Amino acid sequence: MSEPRPVSTRRPVPDDMLGGRLKGSYLLDLELVGVDEIAPHVRLITMASSDLVGFEYTPGQDLLFEVPNGDLTLRRRYTIRRSDPAKGIADFEIEIHDGRGPATRWAAKAELDDHLEAIGPRGGISLRPTATSHLFVVDDSAMPAAFAMLEALPEDTNATVLLVTSHGARSRPAAAGGPAASFVWLDRAEVLELLSDLHPAAGTAAYLFGERHLVRSAEELLIAGGLDRDAIATKAYWRRDQPNASHGEPSYN
């Protein structure tokens, strides 16, 4: 006889919370059940909860975590890397930035049985199923979203992923499913030089995620190369010298 399925206790977010920007999301109570170092500066954190049983989301969406900061909390958004809604678990790949901020300090010291509150799912970026080719340009902060979206594509899809790394760590696990994509690791200057000479074919969909100025520059170069603006999805995860801009809410998407 199988064990009874856990019952979700997640609650809808009040319509007026954060000015109504969280409508359609849920309040979630999560427990940390797994921690693994998967690459330099990257921790894989696994959360579990009955609130995640049957939890539905679109690949690339995230949860807004209430991260402890002394006697207070602050909000940080982390992409759902993968999940098992039958078991009520979800994985998150979190960057460790040399311990400079409260969220980094929490992620670096996170331990089993830690409890956090979160809100989600969040985010409006989604794959374009009618595209004949998919181009991802992402930095370290956005790799979980790109990999999650890539794994949702059919195996016969044409996809290229340009990975912009700031600290030279090119051993991070990539997508485990989806198409046999082409992965190219670059620094910021290299990716902008490559994009300046790129002329995407008709039917290409581009997904530009990461630092705000990188996203803007990449978008301008792709448009100059002939790609229609409507074929480009953008999401700025952070701004240089401005941690937690907009309280964890992307400001350019």
Predicted feature residues:
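Short, conserved phosphate/pyrophosphate- and ester-handling motifs at nucleotide-, phospho-/glycolipid
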Residues: 60, 142, 211
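Active-site beta-strand/loop microenvironment that shapes enzyme catalytic pockets
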Residues: 104, 108-173, 208
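Reductase modules of NAD(P)H-dependent flavoproteins
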Residues: 163-253
